[in-house]
């Protein structure tokens, strides 16, 4: 299989995150473990090499249930202990099609939905942590999409008790189809002018508040500008996601008890109360 090199993916992803966050979010990989084997499914099943190749070739359907046994991985690699000792903050798992990993999942005391149901019985970690599921069949753009959904889940939780215009997250993700004339930055799936999921190459022009978010947050000045897909790469997944992540607020101060630097929540969910 002509799949991507894990180191190249990791370097590209980390570089994009540094750029998008204005240098605030910097990953450091402290250990890499290469596992020669297939992960266990939730019912204990393991693929063997021939069966898996048959699945890839379409000769046999993928095994069901597809979900991986996260607890087997957590126990095998002492994840809870490492998090509790502050030796690691999160875990990245690079795998192959049909491996059964979520794009992201959260564990630890007070863990909440992070594009997947929270991992129960992981309080021994003593703090929240995220496990990212990446695929070396895909590219950096898809890694950024996983990160984008993680950001969406965490910011949705962060602002859940605020309503109306006080819920700045809801304002951030507005796009033209749902809020005519009031498009902001959109979501990871919906650009300001998108008509449907993944519609990042839509050439139509719409009025957007994206510059107000990028340059003036939290002291909005009512700045708007006409934008279209040329702003975020004409449908290029990676370019759109960098553009979107770049617009996430990253300034000092607080409003309604919530930090104006959203990256600190996204990178470390222990900064928020659940």
Give the positions of each predicted feature:
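Flexible, surface-exposed loop/gating regions in the mature catalytic domains
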Residues: 115-136, 243
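Active-site recognition of the HExxH zinc-binding catalytic motif
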Residues: 137-158
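Loop/turn elements at helix/coil->beta-strand transitions in domains of secreted/extracellular proteins
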Residues: 22-26, 86-92, 127
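A short acidic (Asp/Glu
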Residues: 39-42, 102-108, 144, 152-154
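Active-site-proximal beta-strand/loop segments in catalytic clefts of secreted hydrolases
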Residues: 94-98, 134-135, 153
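Auxiliary, metal-adjacent structural segments of Zn-dependent hydrolase domains
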Residues: 77-120
